[in-house]
Amino acid sequence: MSVRQRFLEIRDGFERPFWVANVSEIFERLAYYGAFSSLALYLQGKLNFSTQQTGTLTGLFGGMVWFLAIFGGAVADKLGFRRALSMAYLILAAAYFLIGSIGASWLAPIRGAMPLTVFVGCVLMLPALGIALVKPCVVGTTARASKENVRTLGYSIYYTMVNIGGTAGPFVADWAHRHLGLEKVFRISALSVFAMFFLVLFFFREPGKVGDEPVQSLSQVARNFLAVLWPPRFLIFLIIFTGYWIVFWQQYTSLPGFIHTYVNPNARVELILITD
């Protein structure tokens, strides 16, 4: 096959929903990693949480993101990708805005009505609701809106978009932190995903389904999840592998506070996290 033929295959092999979904993924990852790279500093430096409380809250933030993704696919299939993706970006925009507004005066009545740790914990769980819908929608669109001869390339493009957004996020967070203030990092994350709401609303069209496989209910997804965990060997493997990820994610939960407290309080922590 000539280079020209392959180019034509690639040009014609992806439908418009593929490109809309994957471009939106850049900005969703930018928002997520931008917010996550500044979250520990924000909780510890601006909201005066202890190191232990900061670790617990950032761990809750990251843990809920990955846990709720188990059920996000079933919800996305029921709603349809366009509706689910639009809803996800609206939820994320509101969630990131609320995180950056935790210390604002207009939230003072709510802060005073409950322990601050409980309030912040509830707010930090909100982004997980949006991210749990984004992942299955973008991956599902990549599968449905690409022809079979370029589908493998489609997944490569998807992961490239993830990496671009994941690299840009901490860089943007560093700039916002230094020039606008730490709270504004979360406002920029909110604006990024809010813009993607309009991109999806105006340009995304529901990709065609492959086959007539019935949509699973949330209860069926939960049963399947438990069935997967049942084999003891696989469960032991997951427990062991979990230890690796616990250590890995310390770069977002513990490392920022360590650098700020023990190394250099003026260190540009967000830029350090780009190495991830």
What are these model-derived regions, one by one?
Residues 37-53, 253-276:
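Short amphipathic helix-loop junctions that connect adjacent transmembrane helices
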Residues 2-15, 211-239, 265, 271:
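Juxtamembrane intracellular "pre-TM" segments in multi-pass secondary transporters
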Residues 65, 152-178, 190-196:
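Glycine-rich segments within core transmembrane alpha-helices of 12-TM secondary carriers
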Residues 59-74:
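Central cavity-lining transmembrane alpha-helices of secondary-active solute carriers
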Residues 121, 183-202:
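Symmetry-related core transmembrane helices of the 12-TM Major Facilitator Superfamily/SLC fold
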Residues 78-92:
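Cytoplasmic membrane-interface "Motif A"-like loop-to-helix N-cap segments
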Residues 133-147:
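Intracellular juxtamembrane helix-capping segments at the cytosolic ends
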Residues 90-115:
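C-terminal ends and interior cores of transmembrane alpha-helices
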